[in-house]
């Protein structure tokens, strides 16, 4: 069902909301907003002006219409048939990043540890959070420099690399639910694991920020570690071509890239989608790949690895929208 919004006012339960101050883009190519640089269009894409504007937009969307929150689109594929509902772009909007001065309402710091809390909104790029922490003499967040997405996405999937995960240092979550209610939640309210985070009591809501507790330490050493991690990433990953990072989760006790390479799939290509010759757990767009090319290649890798090794790889990337 199609719903048209008037920019002058938004009808919500209880009356008329303030004027929406953001921008609607109609039939917006999502290839402009995902790191694969491929895929279909969003029927409606909204760029909110700020958090308050986002809240009112969510309250205005009919209950039967899907909402998709997107940051940098670094682990997202939108099928060529496009995506219905409303896509909301958070990167460049929810950008607050600051040392937290308040103590009320936050879990107490562990005894005998000198720590500080950083608040980062969902639209902040993960590498920016890593650099901010290091600049303020805080350690433990360096690995975030290796995550090519936003804080919101990192929290949602418990992103990690180099032996650390996003939820290792989270002490409180800032969320927005489908009713447009802002909440502050504790990590104990979630089930988390490898590339997974979900409320114990399922409820449709999105992460709009998080509070990270980090230890005070040697900021210069932290900045050097970030530089070292980035050098490793540049040397081992195909960053010169459009990609979405790791396509598959590592199975227990093994590596997805090793299994894919062992099956002779490095360099395998469907259309302009190719299994990277540099890192087998990356699929790159070597020209004008379509979302269909990429999805077919993902499925081919899954089927081939399972046939050869009896291991079914689990996807780390998210695919939304309609097939063409």
From Swiss-Prot:
Required co-factors: FAD
Asked whether the UniProt record includes Translocase among its keywords, one would answer no
Entry annotated with the keyword Ubl conjugation: no
GO CC field: cytosol
Give the EC class as a word.
oxidoreductase
Q: Which residues form the active site?
A: 195, 246, 316
Q: Which keywords belong to this entry? A: Cell cycle, Cell division, Cell shape, Cell wall biogenesis/degradation, Cytoplasm, FAD, Flavoprotein, NADP, Oxidoreductase, Peptidoglycan synthesis
Q: Which InterPro entries match?
A: FAD-bd_PCMH, FAD-bd_PCMH-like_sf, FAD-bd_PCMH_sub1, FAD-bd_PCMH_sub2, MurB, MurB_C, MurB_C_sf, Oxid_FAD_bind_N
This protein's superkingdom? Answer: Bacteria
- Report the residue ranges that make up the FAD-binding PCMH-type domain in this protein: 38-231
Give the GO terms filed under biological process for this record: cell division; cell wall organization; peptidoglycan biosynthetic process; regulation of cell shape
- Principal cellular location given in the protein's record: cytoplasm
PROSITE patterns, alphabetized: FAD_PCMH (PS51387)
Name a GO molecular-function annotation: UDP-N-acetylmuramate dehydrogenase activity
Give the function comment from the record: Cell wall formation.
- NCBIfam families given for it? murB, PRK13905.1
Q: What is the protein name given in its UniProt record?
A: UDP-N-acetylenolpyruvoylglucosamine reductase
Give the organism the record lists.
Thiobacillus denitrificans (strain ATCC 25259 / T1)
